[in-house]
Amino acid sequence: DLTNYNPDFNRDVFRDKSEDAYFGYFTGKPMHQLIDWIEEDRNFHAEHINRVLSGMFCCSTADKWSSTHGKDPSITHFHEDGLNRRWNSTQENWINIGDEDAEDQIGSVFAVQGIDLNKVGVMIGPDIRVNEDGKLEAVPDNHNNTNNKFSVEEMTDPMNQFEFTLYILNQYYVLLTRGIDGIRL
């Protein structure tokens, strides 16, 4: 089992469809909707610290990140119908950096570990999928962090695939537990 199953968990938290529900999800232009949701709260609660975060995926809507991109705001990594955003410019104290576009940067798991935010939008990408057995599994080819991947040959071992899946699930767990006041996918 990949989770700590609790039969007493109140699953109604996922059924609340009201606008102010703690948990929710968007379909169709998800990056636009997550950013709009974050910005709407920012307009009403200027003191709130809200961010959009992302798994370490690449490919269709996200370009691969490189440490050489650093603080160059002209290099963007996330693209959706004319909306372009970049990864967080630093992993240390990212929430408090003085970058002009800091609130608009997309945070990675490495930038938000141990940090509580008010509202969090989380982009889940093609680095994880539901397999034919209905179970979550990682997709190494769509994961953009070369420091934590097995080689292609090593991924043929089911134990390595399982370990990598746990690693990716743990990254999403970190992202999905940052929001005090709400989370949207």
Label each residue range with its predicted role:
Residues 100, 105-185:
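C-terminal accessory regions
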Residues 1-136:
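Conserved helicase/translocase motor-coupling segment
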